[in-house]
Amino acid sequence: MIEVSGVSVRLSGKTIISDVAFTAKAGELTAIAGPNGSGKTTTMKAISGELAYGGSVRIGGDEVKGLKPWQLAAIRGVLPQASTISFPFTVREIVRMGLTSGLNLHPDKAEQTAAAALASVDLTGFEGRFYQELSGGEQQRVQLARVLCQIAEPVVDGKPCWLLLDEPVSSLDISHQLTIMTLARNFCERGGGVIAVMHDLNLTALFADRIVLMKSGRLAAPAASFEVLTDETMLSVFGLRVRINQVPADGTPFVLAHSAVSRP
């Protein structure tokens, strides 16, 4: 379980997020959604230990601030937002960077782990290609394969591991969006946990168990089932007039936007 309690982050004297609190459970995919600039990425960086924070973040009962980098690397893998940074390395070299927390792996085992991670994101055969030659979507999948090298199993020594994914499908075509979200779903079903920043609410409703809505650096709604997606909430958080239907087969909510409205 990841417990976020009263978390605040200040950068350059400015409060970016304030009093964020929710719980994410192993075996579930928890989504964080909200408008641009609402504090989603900052929240993820606090949870992962990348940013100093006030309040408390506990993974499996351990305070993140008290864990050493190698301890964090053993229990959580982080996929940052897609970036335009160019790495002068091959795909194989980047993916195997995820193995730095397991340097004692036999070379054959390391190669097998990297190959399995690449296969899971549909990049078999890309091992020798240079990162900067790839499309944005391919680069995003390479970075996810690196994370899957680091966290190859959802449960280690009886304790769940976590994938912290910041917009994992933002650059992907629909086919690979479904591939990656299915992979995340399977990770949860095997005992691990996933927290993912998402923008597509319909894709989120299809794969996530719970959703946390943020606005202006604060929670707009607690981690809850998708009953929180009401017309009123969507208008308040996103400034959109919507109609929320349900998929007849299973009742999954489906958001249809009417029009944008002026924000206060």
Curated annotation (Swiss-Prot):
UniProt keyword Metal-binding present: no
InterPro entries, per the entry: AAA+_ATPase, ABC_transporter-like_ATP-bd, ABC_transporter-like_CS, P-loop_NTPase
Subunit details: The complex is composed of two ATP-binding proteins (HmuV), two transmembrane proteins (HmuU) and a solute-binding protein (HmuT).
Gene3D superfamilies documented for this protein: P-loop containing nucleotide triphosphate hydrolases
Protein's UniProt name: Hemin import ATP-binding protein HmuV
GO cellular component: plasma membrane
All copies of domain ABC transporter, residue ranges: 2-241
Cysteines engaged in disulfide bonds, as pairs: none
Organism in which the protein naturally occurs: Rhizobium leguminosarum
Main EC class the enzyme belongs to: translocase
